[in-house]
Amino acid sequence: MMGIKTILRDKLRNAQRVAVLGIGSQLRADDAAGLLIAKELKTYLKDNKKRNQLKVFLGETAPENLTGQIKKFKPTHLIVIDAVDFHLKTGALRVVDIRTEAGVSFSTHRVPIGILRDYLYKSIYCETILIGMQPGSTEFCGCLSQGVRESTQAASKEIREVLKNFI
């Protein structure tokens, strides 16, 4: 299986403008994974000289509230990062083809990927890439699991390496 870095490089090959949308709740243990990665990327990119080509959005538990801002940015590609229950080992990462896995649900908000994809595509008109991380627990006020902690750090590093072309 290819790593996320290889897959992202391939999917972003013709990208002009990239938006990253982190989704999750810091109050629900491992559900915070997407949000934590996006926050790390936002910090890393704070001195980004090419802000017109790359922007990070923190969607938290209501990513649909940011569609206006994302639409205004006019990305050619949108990377969505969230905890997704694939029934895999805690911390496992997958780049999901949301055109074929429309029945998979996000871990806390339970919005099927297909519905979010259709909503984003109809309002933003861009290629959407989902990076999903398997949560161990989404318990309210729970702690981040070791597997998710390690995977968020590794994923942040790999995504940063791919996005270097845009900074």
Model-predicted segments: where are they?
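N-terminal catalytic or cofactor-binding beta/alpha core of small enzyme domains
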Residues: 1-135, 142-166
